[in-house]
Amino acid sequence: KSLSTYTKYRIGCAYVGEFLQTHYHVKDIALKELSLPFITDYETFLRTDKHLKINSAMVFVRNLRAMVFRAIDNEWLVKDPFRRYEYKEEETTREFLSKEEIHLLMETPITRKKMSMVRDLFLFCCFTGLAFIDLYNLKEENIKEFFDEGEWIVIHRQKTGTEANIKLLDYPKQIMEKYRGLCEDGRVFPVPNYQSCMDSLKRLGKKCGITKPLSWHCTSHSKFFYLLNISELSIL
């Protein structure tokens, strides 16, 4: 599984533990006690106590379902408590960052060291389209020099397994050089854990005056937006 998936499962386990203590006043329950009311109460807990939007809540409900299915496959559980559960989702429009917002990220003075690093990592992904897990796994051996004498990222994307060849523009190369040599395991960047980066990213957005919620999903959309406006990309 990817690092982000692992992180979501860890957070989900913590949510279930908190739900059990606050609503049932126990630390755990037997698998056979899982029921439809338990699941709907857990969904309500996610949406009220944890203030999650419906689609985010469904991520953690589905993670719980995956664990239940594993229990059924291993014959630890006979009945499926999710059998009559109805999933709820809202249609969302994927956000991309505009040229002006990219400029705000690049030019807003940041004095806090960690926030500055997260900004660099985020902008590197904006210019390359790398997902967070691919940024985390990026190694020196993935940086190649091709026939055009330019540097390229050659990497297999973890989510899809497909190879990606990404030309490095000047700005992401500058970011890469800034952190090169800091990792002893051959990775290009000393990437903090996903949740820590997301926390810093939220504060970064507020600091820069960007109203859109920043996430690593924005980076790939921003990259394709700029590829479609290559003349504008050249003047960033």
Report each predicted region and the residues it spans.
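N-terminal DNA-binding recognition helix of tyrosine site-specific recombinases/integrases
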Residues: S4, G12-T22, T48-F82, I133
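Short basic/aromatic active-site micro-motif
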Residues: L34, V59, M117-V118, V191-Q195, ...
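C-terminal catalytic core of Y-nucleophile DNA break-rejoin enzymes
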Residues: R157-E177, L182-R203, G209, S215
